Every structure is written in C-alpha cells, then in structure tokens.
Amino acid sequence: MTALSEPRTRLLTRSFALVWALTFVTFFAAFQLFPTVPLRLRELGASLAESGRFMSLFTAGSAIGALFTGPLGDRVGHRRLVVTCALLYACFLGGYALLTSRWGFYLLAFPHGIVWSGLLTATMASLAHVLPEDRRADGLSLYGLASPGGVIVGPLLGLWIFQHGGFAPIGWYLAALFLLLGLLGTTLPADHPHGRAEGFKWPNAAVLAPCLVLFCVALGYGALGSYTAQEGLALGMPLPSAFLSFMAVGMVLMRIIMLKRGFGRRPIRKLPGMLVGAFAGMALLALLPGGMVRHMASALLYGAGYSMLHTLLNAKLLESVDPQRRGSAFGALLFAFDAGIGLGSFSLGWVIGHHGYRLGWGLGAVAMLAALPTALRLGKD
C-alpha cells in the first residue's frame, strides 16, 4: 500500500474543537470591546483623543506580557495557564461592566492585555498537543479561521448591544462566557511530562527569523486597523469599513482553498509567495485610483496573503522549536506582532496625518518588502 492510499489521521477531535472555540471567543470578545470601550469612555467624559488610550495600554500589556506568559506556560503547564487566564479574563470583563470612571478602564487595560497574551500563547501551545504531526499545516489552516471569524462577528454584535442596552450587558454576558470556557478548559489534554520546562527559558535563535517577518508585516497591519475606515469616511464611501470586511473575506477564502489543496511536505516554502501577495494588496491600496473598489480589491489580495503568514510561521515553530520552549516561542512571536502593530499605528499614523493616507499605505508595503529576504531564507531551510 502506498503512502497516498493510507487513511489520513483524524483532525476534527473534541480537543481541537475546544481549542478552536477558545480562540474564536477570545477574538469575539476582544473585538466587541475594542469598538465599544472608546464609546463608553466618551460617555464618561473622555475626549476623542483620550478614548484611544485604552487600546494603547492594552496592546502594551499584551506585547510585554507575551515575553513572560510564554515561558510561564512552559513551566506551569499550558492547560493550567489557559484555565487561569480564561477565569481572569472573566473577572476583567465583569469589572468593566461595573466601572463608572474612565480611569478604571485605563488601570485595568494593561493587566488585561497581559492576560490576553497569556491566553493566546497558552492556547496556541496547547494546539500542539491536539494536532496530529502529519496534519499540522491543515490543522493550523482550519484553526486560523477562528480569529477572523471572531473579528467579523464581534464588532457587529458588540455595537448592536451597546446601542440597544448600553455597555454593561456586554461585560456581563462575556464574563459568563469566559467562566464557562475556563471550566471547559480543564478538559483539555494534559501537558506531556517532557513539555514542562524546568525553569523559565527564553526562545532560541530559531524564533528570530519568524519574529522579524511578522514584525515587518505588523507595521503595516497596525495602520490598516486604525485608518482604513477613516479614509473610507473621508472619501464618503457607502461602506467605510470595506477594507476590513473584505480583508476577512480574503482570509477565509484563502484558508478554504489551502484546506482543499493541501500544503505539501514543507509548508514554509509557501511563505515568500504569501508575503508577496500581502505586499501587493497593500501596494494596490496605495497606488490604485478611486475609493470603494480600491479598498475591496486590495483587501481581498492582502487578506489572502496575510492570513497564511501566521499559519506558516506557526507551523515552522511547531516543527523547529523544542517542545519545552513552545510557550516562550509563541510568546516571542506575539510580542513581535503586537510591537509591530503599536509602532506601525503610531508611526504610520503620524505619516498619514501629515502627508496623507496613500503615503502611509506605501510605507507599510515597503516594510513588508523588507521582510522578503528573511522569508526567502526561511523557505529554503
């Protein structure tokens, strides 16, 4: 019997579904908070500029926390960290529902970001225990649908609840949801004995190249989330959020295509092509004429390439990193991503404010192009 005729290992297990659900709900909850917390802060007296402080503090907490929560998961166990962070997440959400002062939001944002990073790194590391080795790329591609799914649905529901019932119901029902997820997290597979690090360990050199690629990509991505809708409003587009919506569509379509086609024996070989696709999408956003059609076309191309970058880099880490250091490796990757988002949103935002949107999009594309030599080297390793 040839290898082609051998049955494929089962991918859709209960444990995989639980890890998928944890990630979906994490992004589903976050992207209900991100658009509604600023609105709540405005109700409490914050100015338009001040209302952005929550996101800045949250991202800072996530970036810094990722460096420590990753190694912590290696030491205490990823399942234990998933459960702990889910329960803490519920406490933060319930706390937001009770707050009547905007300063309370600012005080909670930074530690909440740390818990967010712990939940993401521990969930990603737990995924290694539920994916069969011969189907890791397929599993990561399917798993990658969780975050864009949450991003698509979360803002729509969050804004609807806020408009009809205020902010408190969002905090309360999401807190209850995370309490349930924390309890379900106790049923995740136990960490393997060899997966417990003897002490805190920083990621090795194998993580540096993936971090550099993701950092360069995040520089442009950080500006997209903050400013594409504002450009849409300035241009009078009928759907100002067209770029973000069609980016998510591109992400989902590419993942469906790759699930059908497969990744081959060495998925990382596809990294340079996906990076070029994302670069082309952002370049089109900077160069094409018009408004709505430009946003839609560039977003589809950008989303298709961008979505697979995370999958391919995560698969590379699972393949090359010592199991005892997986948590710290994913933490370093999350740190690089969040740091890039923060720096890109700040620096490209300044460029956009002083020189226009198109120059900002162009510089974001150049930042991605700078990662191409590293991506080519990773594809050959």
Q: How should each PLM-predicted stretch be described?
A:
Residues 66-77, 254-267:
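Helix-to-loop junctions at the C-terminal end of transmembrane segments
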Residues 14-44, 48-52, 221-231:
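Helix-loop boundary and gating motifs at the non-cytosolic
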Residues 81-94, 269-283:
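Structural signature of the two symmetry-related core transmembrane helices
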